[in-house]
């Protein structure tokens, strides 16, 4: 990475936890509903919302539960790099 490329990457990086939280609310789903499907407690869900990045396996599970391809966000960043 050059410094300029790194700066572009950082500006474009998303806070995946916030995006997941917004999608959950958009679907009008509760944190309890989400926690049950993730097989964790609500505290863990709130911890996910605070995370800027997530393990890919967890992100895949979340994508399946919410029927939303969160990986597309990263693909778009990759495809739009200069």
Predicted regions and their residues:
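Residue-level signal for the short linker/turn that defines the boundary of a DNA-recognition helix
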Residues: 3, 29, 54-57
């Amino acid at each position: 990475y050059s410094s300029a490329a790194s700066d572009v990457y950082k500006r474009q990086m998303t806070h995946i936890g916030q995006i997941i939280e917004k999608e959950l609310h958009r679907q009008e789903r509760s944190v309890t509903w989400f926690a049950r499907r993730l097989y964790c407690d609500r505290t863990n869900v709130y911890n996910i919302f605070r995370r800027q990045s997530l393990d890919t396996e967890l992100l895949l599970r979340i994508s399946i539960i919410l029927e939303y391809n969160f990986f597309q966000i990263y693909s778009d960043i990759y495809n739009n790099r200069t």
